[in-house]
Amino acid sequence: TLNFPADCMVGLLGPDGVGKSSLMSIISGVRKIQAGKVDVLGGDIGLESHRTAACPRIAYMPQGLGKNLYMTLSVYENLDFFGRLFGQDKTERDRRIDELLASTGMSPFKQRPAGKLSGGMKQKLGLCCSLIHDPDLLILDEPTTGVDPLSRRQFWDLIKRIRVQRPQMSVLVSTAYMDEADGFDWLIAMDDGKVLAEGTPAELKSRVGVDNLDAAFIRLLPEAKRQGHKALVVPPRNVAMEGTPAIQAEGLTRRFGDFTAVDHVSFKIPKGEIFGFLGSNGCGKTTTMKMLTGLLPSTEGTAMMFGEKVTGKDLATRKRIGFMSQAFSLYAELTVRQNLVLHARVFDLPKDQIGPRINELIKQFGLENYIEDLAESLPLGTRQRLSLAVAMIHKPELLILDEPTSGVDPVARESFWELLIHLSRNDKVTIFVSTHFMNEAGWCDRISLMHSGKVLASDPPAKLVANCGAKTLEEAFISYLEKAAAANAATDTPVAESKSPPQTVPETPHALNTGFRWRRLFGYAYREALELKRDTIRLTFALGGSILMMLVLGFGINLDVEDIAVSMFDNDNSPASLRYADNIAGSSYFVQKPPVTDPDALERRLRKGDLDVVVEIPPNFGKDVARGANTEIAAWVNGSMPSRAQSVAGYVQGLHSDFVARTVPPSVAAPKVGIQPLLEMRYRYNQDFKSIYAMVPPTIPIILVLIPAMLMALGVVREKELGSIYNFYSTPVTRLEFIFGKQLPYAAVAMINLVVLSVMAVTVFQVPLKGSVLALLLGGFLYVICTTSLGFVMSAFTSTQIAAIFGTAIATILPATQFSGLTQPVSALEGTGAIIGKVYPTAHFITISQGVFNKALGFKDLIDPFLALAVSIPILTAISWMLLKKQES
């Protein structure tokens, strides 16, 4: 139970996993409340009515660098989109955007894509997007995690200036950085989902009798968690053990296309040293580590490990290295012991050494109580120690640790560093560790300050501080960053900002942002269209994929039975048998092959596949025909393809009947019983039985159900994966606005596909379009609305893009090909298949497509499938609306 003071900056303090983000998402209305009640801005946020009314007054910036941004959109386009979501017209949007960019010093980067901004700039842009509608409550979830110290300081200076202008705005912030929490008005310390204490920073420190928040937080932890904790002491390193450097890099460079991730980095790390790599997210730390271990080749420069050049194939050198990634490199479904055994076998430890080594590590790293626990069930600090034990299983001489303490509490962090110091000083293990925590950097023997792929300085922490005349390591880092920014005018981190906050006066009352608004709908549609236009892979798949499928299916699905290889096995050689052979050879469906001379040849050639059918004429065939006696002819058909064999048998039977009718006298062929009616079959459509006329028109609906549905599902699931779905959760956008806004661009692309595929049908496949073009276009429009709605429905059941691709493909292609009249009429289906065929949209558009192309039909003739598609749209939209949640569960 908590009461948050208004009109001030409140900080939630604690490591990852203690419940800060969950609490903030509940307060913002993004996440559902399972139990209890939360009053926000004068009402229960759990009630949809109050949540709808309060949403325009709240701004929520989720955790993660630029998580609420769209990386292919420019700075201006991101802000413009958020302005549309809050109902602002263009004049008001442009004014607010100009003021916000001027205040944050981002005006020079107005047209730069968000994906090309530095971490600090992304956070500033995210803040601008949150402030564009003048919120009364600003919620920031770890806004500066992974950001360099200079950008972090600029970010908080900006917040202070904005609060001076709008003192009535309450700010709720979560952070894991104790130094920045010291500047908040009110703090709430949390652990394991519970509140440890609350008060001003000064009150929390005085309550436990310490002078810094790091120590205060440790004192506030439960006794069980801080039992045995003592201040960390780093003994001096014995330089006498130095020899050949453990790591040596000269001019190490890595480029990805035009982007330089690591730019001519050089350093030397002696054996047994703890070397720290300090820098913000995206500065090149992880890329450098991967090059040093041979996991990633360098573009330029060399990396040496224990005097040997690092290559991806040098397994002997790799066995001297232990690597611990940010994700801990553990198998979640295995127990602690199983993880250790698996990695021991990976490194080829002798069987008799595996058991003792595992027992040694379990004792050394304090894992005795977790031996049979699954890795995924371990507390974060324990999982961290297990990951280090896994990295040490083969007794490496070098440990490379990539941000190993990110997100853990101060006690666990210091305990972890005690292990590292023991390994360095007692076991002579060289440790190369990356971090963005300043206090950790102070525990290293030497550190390199890295920014934008370059090493700014490399020295012991105390020397770096002294060289800059700074008081702390953070101030020293900021000094180096400012010098680098001054030397490079094109840097992403401008040193000059407007000192005045944005002078925005709300012109659109918050109350007007509720209800259905076309501006928000078209805002989503415009943003989706921009992203689709700039995503060459999706756009190529949408347009090029349709053309490719049309060519493959149009030419590949051919049910015509032609060029039938036939051979005669004539045992009579009479004029009658020759006439019979000529009757078959004269058919355009058959290709005459050399005759068969004996039964062995007949069987051999059929088995080899040279022949489709052999017609065997018996001896005395001519004589029997002449005197009207019964005689038989054998037709040996290759049955390896049953459907083709069935058609071949039918052709032979037809030619045989024709020969009998023309050769055998009617009195012999059939007894005359009264007057026989004369029936002649005439086919109204496709008189030549060409399968291309039957298959190409239905192929268009098949393509238009697969690709638009898949694109739609990917468009929604992609937002879930990237985190931009929070913009839907935390803004006044209604579910219908979101559905139709996402749907319109993909429906437009599908209509372009319909036109292209129809033109291909007429020009490439020579299938004439005999009916109403307008009827085809109207039916196509109704159909693509249905198919994109199907994709939206599928997105509700998937959370990854891979699952969306496969799930949507299965859910659309199977009903479309099996129950929609592609291979057999819907009227011929029975049971469940008949029900699916009658309700599935593809069946109705196949009727429209075939009717327009082959039967010259128009609106009046196709009224039933038009009505069926029109009725399907609100049904599918209603299903999408019900499945789409406005809050996280």
Feature locations, PLM:
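Extracytoplasmic/periplasmic domains immediately adjacent to an N-terminal transmembrane anchor
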Residues: 511-693
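ABC ATPase "signature
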Residues: 198-199, 458-459
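Membrane-spanning alpha-helical segments of multipass transporters and channels
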Residues: 222, 241, 548-554, 573, ...
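Conserved ABC transporter NBD signature motif
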Residues: 36-47, 53-56, 301-312, 316-317
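Conserved ABC ATPase "signature" region
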Residues: 80, 84, 91-109, 341, ...
